[in-house]
A protein has these predicted regions:
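Active-site acidic-Proline motif in GNAT/NAT acetyltransferases
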Residues: 79-81, 85, 112-113
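Acetyl-CoA-dependent GNAT
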Residues: 3-81, 92-94, 98, 150-151
């Protein structure tokens, strides 16, 4: 499904050498897969803050709490054929509930150019913390929107 999403939407922007490892980083707390009609239709992960995550630091500075009080929602994608069924919102709800059950505040970073994701997050009530520039490599600079789940 990840390859299908990458071909259709360009996500992830940089195709990983090992898609399985990309989906299960060492910082992973939990992940979920959605199925529709017996087929994998989507995925989401929940991780501890890592290098390059801007949203945890922004939220912790605003909240006056440690960055360790956050959980990063990441690796959300829905197969193109499965869109329009609420799968993205369902997966987001699961990740948010898990973070909150662990006493963590959910945050996320998203490319500003990923307008479908931005629309989903804002429709779900996520609050924009900031828009920042990130240097992903010497030749790749991107604009990222940082969000926190509503309190």
């Amino acid at each position: 499904v990840l390859a299908e999403v990458h071909e259709h939407d360009g996500y992830p922007v940089n195709w990983p050498d090992s898609p399985g490892a990309w989906l299960t980083p060492p910082s992973l707390i939990a992940s979920w897969v959605a199925e529709l009609d017996g087929r994998v239709a989507g995925h989401i992960g929940l991780s501890r803050s890592g290098v390059g995550d801007a949203a945890p630091g922004l939220w912790s500075a605003r909240a006056g709490l440690s960055i360790d009080a956050t959980a990063v929602v990441n690796r959300l994608f829905v197969a193109p054929w499965a869109r329009g069924h609420g799968i993205g919102a369902l997966l987001m709800g699961q990740a948010v509930a898990e973070a909150q059950d662990r006493g963590l505040h959910p945050v996320l970073d998203v490319l500003a150019s990923d307008t479908a994701a931005v629309v989903l997050y804002e429709r779900l009530g996520w609050q924009l913390l900031a828009t920042v520039e990130q240097q992903w490599s010497p030749e790749q600079k991107v604009t990222v929107r940082c969000y926190a789940a509503a309190t």
